[in-house]
Design a protein with these regions (language model features):
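Eukaryotic, polar/proline-rich low-complexity intrinsically disordered regions
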Residues: 2-268
Length: 268
């Protein structure tokens, strides 16, 4: 008996148990780590069992497939829709059906892709990177192409956070925050932890700048709610920023977690 090529090629490493979930007798193939599944009662989820009712649910895609499609979605919706011959409107929206067809045409290993697969990825993305309205989809932040944002501007926290290299703090205190060359907006984080995690991608021990959003908004500057933890603004003046002390309890807790992870890796 042979199993479907897509499952075998995209679901390694595999745990062999007693019954393959789609009806093949003899084996069950499951990822040892994460996968995207669907519970009939509670919708899409990541993991082996529904977080609400603990039912196994229906297999949708492996973590490798989810990661690969997610990266492709981010690239197309943020940076290069023209490479996939897709039309984007002024607010960043692209037709889901057209994107499905284009992905299948240009990436043949996604021949199984359907529009609802994009919905599954969007609903399980804890960063809120994507938004679906009807039959349209867009990225919520990190665009390098020019679009006109129509994100909500209400319910902005009193303070937001931004990570930076500790050696560059004085520059930001003097000049404020401006978008990078690859982005159209300054991307601010909802919490210190969010900012630390964002900064840790490129900086070993990022410093954290706190932004007084109450004063900024009162002075007429617009801040948008984009992803789940991401907020956007065109710039932040020096008068609205301050540096979080390195001995802040939250920062110290996160650094301790990183140090434990690093020590564990060295022991492997």
């Amino acid at each position: 008996m042979s199993c479907p090529k897509r499952l075998l090629s995209s679901s390694l490493p595999l745990l062999i148990t007693s019954k393959y979930r789609t009806g093949y007798e003899g084996v069950t193939l499951r990822r040892l780590d994460t996968m995207l599944r669907q519970c009939n009662a509670h919708g899409y989820f990541i993991g082996l069992n529904c977080h609400v009712c603990n039912e196994e649910g229906k297999f949708i895609m492996s973590d490798r497939e989810m990661s690969g499609i997610g990266r492709l979605m981010a690239g197309v919706l943020r940076h290069f829709p023209e490479k996939f011959n897709l039309e984007m409107d002024i607010n960043g929206w692209i037709n889901i059906g057209s994107m499905t067809d284009s992905f299948k045409e240009q990436r043949h290993y996604y021949h199984w892709l359907r529009p609802w697969h994009f919905k599954a990825i969007c609903e399980c993305d804890d960063k809120g990177r994507f938004q679906i309205e009807g039959d349209m989809i867009r990225a919520t932040y990190a665009h390098s192409i020019e679009i006109e944002l129509d994100h909500p501007t209400d319910d902005i926290p009193e303070a937001l956070y931004w990570p930076c290299n500790p050696e560059e703090i004085e520059t930001y205190l003097e000049l404020g925050l401006k978008p990078s060359e690859k982005q159209n907006y300054v991307h601010l984080s909802k919490t210190i932890r969010n900012a630390m995690e964002a900064g840790h991608v490129h900086i070993n021990r990022p410093a954290i700048i706190e932004i007084d959003t109450t004063r900024s908004i009162a002075d007429g500057h617009v801040i948008y709610r984009a992803g789940t933890t991401v907020f956007l603004t065109e710039a932040v003046l020096p008068s609205y920023i301050d540096v979080m002390p390195s001995d802040d309890p939250v920062i110290q807790e996160i650094v301790s977690e990183w140090e434990e992870e690093e020590a564990a890796k060295e022991e492997e």
